[in-house]
Amino acid sequence: MNKKKKPFLGMPAPLGYVPGLGRGATGFTTRSDIGPARDANDPVDDRHAPPGKRTVGDQMKKNQAADDDDEDLNDTNYDEFNGYAGSLFSSGPYEKDDEEADAIYAALDKRMDERRKERREQREKEEIEKYRMERPKIQQQFSDLKRKLAEVTEEEWLSIPEVGDARNKRQRNPRYEKLTPVPDSFFAKHLQTGENHTSVDPRQTQFGGLNTPYPGGLNTPYPGGMTPGLMTPGTGELDMRKIGQARNTLMDMRLSQVSDSVSGQTVVDPKGYLTDLNSMIPTHGGDINDIKKARLLLKSVRETNPHHPPAWIASARLEEVTGKLQVARNLIMKGTEMCPKSEDVWLEAARLQPGDTAKAVVAQAVRHLPQSVRIYIRAAELETDIRAKKRVLRKALEHVPNSVRLWKAAVELEEPEDARIMLSRAVECCPTSVELWLALARLETYENARKVLNKARENIPTDRHIWITAAKLEEANGNTQMVEKIIDRAITSLRANGVEINREQWIQDAEECDRAGSVATCQAVMRAVIGIGIEEEDRKHTWMEDADSCVAHNALECARAIYAYALQVFPSKKSVWLRAAYFEKNHGTRESLEALLQRAVAHCPKAEVLWLMGAKSKWLAGDVPAARSILALAFQANPNSEEIWLAAVKLESENNEYERARRLLAKARSSAPTARVFMKSVKLEWVLGNITAAQELCEEALRHYEDFPKLWMMKGQIEEQGELMERAREAYNQGLKKCPHSTPLWLLLSRLEEKIGQLTRARAILEKSRLKNPKNPGLWLESVRLEYRAGLKNIANTLMAKALQECPNSGILWSEAVFLEARPQRKTKSVDALKKCEHDPHVLLAVAKLFWSERKITKAREWFHRTVKIDSDLGDAWAFFYKFELQHGTEEQQEEVRKRCENAEPRHGELWCAVSKDITNWQRKIGEILVLVAARIKNTF
């Protein structure tokens, strides 16, 4: 019992108890406390009831309060102006009209409360600040003194006295000292256990004496009577420290002897002995009582059913887990006596026993179970010598010649020639094992392998692997014409034997053949099974999915076979030709791509994209005349095709044939006068420096296509390039009248006004653009950046908040919002952005830049990879990725990013378009533009 807590605390007071009466205090009672007189025989006693329930007066008040629910309509409760103090109809029903009236009054109260709410809150805030300035907190008053606490040293801290009234505490709270004699059992116990010091004094000499630390002292030559050195004999105590040292020495000697002996090599590992001991310690978290219960239950099971093998195995494993390995061994050996025909018991006994003993256990098991394959395998595993393993397995095969597992284990230990001989015998003993037949075929010569596979087909006519292996054998020996026949015969034979042709399994086999290098076999398998089990209307879709799956599994020849078969079935489908062409472009050679495109344009001459891909392939290879000839053929098939005209113009302009490009554009304007043709004509003259011709062509184009915004943009940019700001503004304004929903036109006009210093006008233009084009992220982004460039960061943040409310799923806005925040809040903002736009490339790019700014290189590289994977057309992502690798990557990584960018050929991105569409960079390649954009990036984010 706690000495401080009294036993009567928390108990009800005895009857008639008066507080303080024991120390002389006198209480008094009144009539209201006593209450009315009561009979002496009345058992009820309310003198100690809670307040408010003790007297009759309290009960009367309670009854009166219960009656107060009724309306008090007395004249004393009536006022001429306000009427009755309470509601006259409080007891009436609360109807819908009353609810509407209350709602109206509540709305009025709320409206009145909101009036001047901001002024009231501002006034209250100022009053609170004024009050805190006049009456600061104690914490604020001592803040300057608290700073000086940093100068206090550790010694000064320790010298500060404890807080408390220590004047006469002992006199006020006297505590009697208790003395208890030490029992004799205490001394006897410590005398028996040899209690003594276990620490060694650093001054101790070799024989136990102490070196006197002072110059004038003497070195004690011999140990004293009870010094930490050699213990004085005759004391009757034991030195436990020396006993432990002797035991460790003895253990080292035994381990050394064991490590030197050959027979103990597999029994004890001296270096790992302590590790083995630790592994024997039970690692479970169960209660010791649970172990005892389990032990009793298992004992009961063993006694009631001693011939039940799982009981013996479970008992042995329980003892093993608890660390009693020898008990476990004894139990399992007794289990082998009770269950000599149980394979599991013998295997468990062999597992628990050490090396040589385990061999003896297995030998005994073989005598009881001479047909057990698992015991023979365990016996072979226990042998360390290869010859001994072979001897065990051959002995096993004498007893169990039809075990495939034993044959496989024996063959794995043999040399190729001996293995071939053993497999010849194995297929005789196990004629239904496909693995043994195939292994024998792989070890035989070509002619013998064919004979082996023929015998295998006779013995196992329902297995497809034998047929596929035969096809691979013919392909490996150059008989590719036999591959197709073998696969066709396989399908026919398997169906004749009642085997269902599983299309997915055959496709997996074809992929394995592809990975093994058997191209002809995989293609033959694909052609044979690709159309099995598919509805006619689902063929195209299913085959395209199969091709994509093969590409994902890196089985390119299988995918090529699928495309070839699909093109035979659908020779006029442009989409199939395109998929096959893109496959060859990404995974094939230039020659295979061009050959495929030649076949494609022969079957689909109206497919412009196929002609253009062929011309581009020739042009990239440097064969410009071949590209021209392809485009000429394309003109014949598509005489008024805008795409082919523009491709021809680009081909000539890229090869500096400007006059030929002009003539082509002139012909195109006469035969196919489209807006894009006019735009390319204007741009050609513009980049060549013929500004007058460009302006004339632009005016002519606008007369025909005044609703084409890019023409108005080019007109304004040409004027802006010549420093003719008024004419540029007029061009943009005219363009916006014709194309009010063109975001780039609004941006160009706004930036023009900002460039000449008209910030207010630029802001007004953007506000007007947002009214005409609501929920436009590009316009909101430009508005935010305009304020940010002007130094008005608060207004920029406010606009960004409004923009995110209007366009909550805009990735470009969220990416900008991340870097508008202060550094500590950027990570939180990026999490919000990812929740809203998980797969937006701008948000992924912002996260990559965020990790880059925090110098988390690995994570930044991972997020850059995600960005370019999800949208390879975003040039800004490639530029930032390349800049990142320039600073933190190797030359190989930089080159990889550049090559991937060139293959992706990005066309979009704010920074990318600013460089790629610059007139001075019109002839630059993708790789050069990438370098220029990366050079413009300054990682100040």
Swiss-Prot record:
Segments of this protein annotated with the region Disordered: 1-79
Phosphothreonine sites (modified residues): 180, 266, 275
Subcellular location: Nucleus, Nucleoplasm; Nucleus speckle
This protein's record includes keyword Methyltransferase: no
Post-translational modification, as annotated: Phosphorylated by PRP4K during spliceosome assembly.
Entry keyword annotation includes Phosphoprotein: yes
Composition bias type Acidic residues, residue spans: 66-78
Ranges for the HAT repeats: 384-416, 418-444, 445-476, 554-586, 588-620, 622-654, 689-721, 723-755, 855-887
Pfam families reported for this sequence: PRP1_N, TPR_16, TPR_19
GO molecular function: identical protein binding; protein-macromolecule adaptor activity; ribonucleoprotein complex binding; RNA binding
PANTHER family to which the protein is assigned, alphabetical: PRE-MRNA SPLICING FACTOR, PRE-MRNA-PROCESSING FACTOR 6
Subunit and partners: Identified in the spliceosome B complex. Identified in the spliceosome C complex. Associates with the U5 snRNP particle. Component of the U4/U6-U5 tri-snRNP complex composed of the U4, U6 and U5 snRNAs and at least PRPF3, PRPF4, PRPF6, PRPF8, PRPF31, SNRNP200, TXNL4A, SNRNP40, DDX23, CD2BP2, PPIH, SNU13, EFTUD2, SART1 and USP39, LSm proteins LSm2-8 and Sm proteins. Interacts with ARAF1. Interacts with AR and NR3C1, but not ESR1, independently of the presence of hormones. Interacts with USH1G.
Name the UniProt record assigns to this protein: Pre-mRNA-processing factor 6
Source species: Rattus norvegicus
Taxonomic classification: Eukaryota, Metazoa, Chordata, Craniata, Vertebrata
Gene behind the chain: Prpf6
